[in-house]
């Protein structure tokens, strides 16, 4: 149903077009990978971005949030875009505040906050491979520009034979253009 039209990667650094670049106080190299898709059934196009912000660098997370906003606008323009990832930041933290700041024309919407139905599942998204979630706050998000309707939002916390698939719970949103 989805036809990939284009894809690229940029680095979360002061030189985002330089492969392997790392800046600010980042512990390791971090990226954003994006793709443009055509929905062959609906005839629409949209962009999907995925990222993983640094786990150590507070400055790196802040600057990555700013860079992400500017690059999403530069790449996607007014075309619908969904941005997913591990932002290593809780809702009250500066990177998420930057991303969702309604006073900034580039801001994105947190799908959990604007969903048409109540969120399903635990609030926290990091589990550390342990049976109890470590935090009651998310660090993994699905953001969108203003082109989508959010029908459902969930954090999926099931295990298989007592084992977690990841140290993070899956975050799911049902979106409609």
Predicted regions and their residues:
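Conserved catalytic scaffold of divalent metal-dependent phosphoesterases
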Residues: 36-39, 47-57
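Conserved hydrophobic/aromatic beta-strand scaffold that supports enzyme active sites
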Residues: 32-36, 50, 141-142, 170-172
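Active-site metal-binding loops of divalent metal-dependent hydrolases
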Residues: 51-53, 86-87, 169
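Metal-dependent phosphoester-hydrolase catalytic domains
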Residues: 2-7, 59, 63, 70-81, ...
């Amino acid at each position: 149903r989805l036809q990939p039209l284009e894809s690229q990667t940029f680095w979360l650094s002061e030189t985002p077009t330089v492969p392997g670049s790392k800046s600010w106080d980042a512990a390791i190299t971090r990226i954003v990978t994006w793709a443009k898709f055509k929905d062959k059934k609906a005839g629409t196009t949209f962009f999907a971005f995925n990222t993983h912000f640094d786990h150590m660098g507070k400055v790196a997370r802040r600057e990555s949030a700013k860079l992400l906003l500017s690059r999403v606008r530069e790449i996607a323009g007014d075309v619908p875009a969904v941005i997913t990832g591990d932002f290593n930041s809780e809702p009250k933290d500066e990177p998420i505040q930057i991303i969702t700041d309604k006073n900034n024309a580039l801001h994105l919407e947190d799908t959990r906050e604007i969903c048409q139905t109540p969120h399903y599942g635990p609030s926290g998204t990091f589990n550390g491979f342990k049976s109890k979630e470590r935090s009651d706050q998310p660090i993994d998000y699905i953001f969108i520009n203003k082109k989508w309707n959010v029908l459902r939002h969930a954090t999926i916390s099931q295990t298989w034979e007592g084992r977690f698939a990841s140290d993070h719970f899956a975050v799911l949103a049902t979106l409609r253009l």
